[in-house]
Regions:
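Catalytic domains of carbohydrate-active enzymes that cleave complex glycans
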Residues: 1-384
Length: 385
């Protein structure tokens, strides 16, 4: 038993009884657990010595079973798009990549039933608190996955309606959010919240759509604003605030962590760099430092993970399951791409590089990714059509 401080008020809606705490019917808790299991799977699968308790298969199976259990044990709220719900797409992709087809088929059928329901609704953005831009992320991802293009377009339009781009750190890519301070803030009131987790989560579908429409720089600006907004509420000592108070009389973070974890999830899973050529602005780097020469342009990555880069002139999306990209270079004439990988570490002796089918490397393939032995010094890969 844990002794609770008797000086606190334990009679509010936020204080749950044992019976309420044991209730499995709140679907919004399931993506957190599924994501945790999925991360353990990927750490065990692609790195050495990080995860020792169970084999990687156990964690991927648990992630999938948790995802399915959400619809069985929490069917009411599972009808809505979930915060962090795009992790279910990632879990499904990995199940198929690993050949766990029976479990993958079951998860796919479960999620398609939800997407079928959304396809019949004009604006399927309900939620526990449906006014707060929480359902769009997963609704877009599954609508896009299952080919409900019109519904994906409606969802993206809704996101862009409340996620602006402007030259201001607080409002660029800031998704609509007003009410969570009232219920979960140290300073409790209704106000425009700066970079609540709506920013980090809604950036996921925006950047996903940008990679499908790489001529639309507006999408990149909005999506990257939301992506970086997700880390703007981390203090120097590492505290993650739910959001920043926008009232001119305050202008400071809220001193409760609230739901910050979902924002950090949005940054972690969506962290990526973009090398872009724009007709008006020339070459640009999002998530990196740019150096341009006569025949080439180079971007040194500055993102946290350094495991994803998009070369916009080629619409080339490169992701790593392990390892890190130090820089990417693009030859303007030959369209050749050079990818410099960071040296090996004790836990990461190999890089696992995912490329489109039209690009091939002379390395072994493991579940669709090129397994590349890293060295004590950086190595460079040359990518050609």
């Amino acid at each position: 038993d844990y002794k609770y401080n008797p000086d606190f008020d334990w009679t509010t809606w936020a204080s749950w009884s044992k019976e309420q705490s044991d209730n499995l019917g709140r679907s919004f808790n399931y993506p957190h657990v599924a994501a945790a299991q999925w991360v353990l799977y990927r750490l065990a699968r692609f790195n050495e010595g990080l995860v020792k308790t169970h084999p990687w298969q156990t964690y991927l199976q648990r992630a999938a079973e948790t995802s399915i259990a959400m619809t069985e044990l929490a069917p009411h709220y599972a009808q809505f798009g979930q915060m962090e719900g795009d992790v279910f797409v990632a879990i499904l992709d990995d199940l198929y990549a690993e050949g766990m087809n029976a479990l993958a088929d079951k998860l796919k059928a479960t999620m398609k039933a939800r997407a079928d329901h959304w396809s019949e609704l004009a604006y399927p953005f309900g939620s526990e608190m449906p006014w707060d831009s929480t359902g769009q992320e997963e609704v877009y991802m599954w609508s896009d996955y299952f080919g409900y293009d019109a519904k994906a377009a409606v969802t993206l339009s809704a996101i862009l309606a409340y996620m602006p781009t402007m030259p201001h750190w607080a409002y660029n890519g800031n998704a609509r959010r007003y009410w969570d301070f009232l219920y979960g803030g140290k300073l409790s009131r209704v106000e425009r919240q700066i970079h609540h987790y709506g920013s980090g989560l809604n950036a996921i579908p925006v950047l996903d759509n940008y990679r499908e429409n790489p001529e639309d720089l507006h999408l990149l600006k909005v999506g990257y604003g939301g992506l970086l907004g997700a880390v703007s509420n981390i203090t120097e000592d590492g505290f993650g605030a739910a959001a920043f108070h926008s009232w001119p009389s305050t202008l400071e973070i809220d001193y409760l962590s609230g739901d910050y974890g979902s924002n950090f999830y949005g940054y972690a899973i969506n962290s990526s760099a973009y090398l872009v050529e724009d007709a008006e602005l020339g070459y640009l780097a999002f998530g990196g430092n740019l150096t341009e020469e006569k025949n080439s342009v180079t971007m040194q990555l500055t993102t946290a993970a350094k495991n994803a880069v998009f070369v916009q002139p080629l619409a080339l999306w490169i992701t790593l399951d392990a390892g890190a990209v130090q820089q990417v270079s693009f030859d303007k004439k030959t369209k050749e791409v050079q990818l410099r990988l960071a040296p090996k570490t004790e836990i990461t002796p190999f890089a696992y590089v995912n490329l489109p089918e039209e690009y091939a490397l002379d390395y072994e393939k493991v579940r669709g990714a090129y397994k590349i032995p890293l060295q004590a010094k950086p190595i460079t890969l040359t990518l050609k059509h």
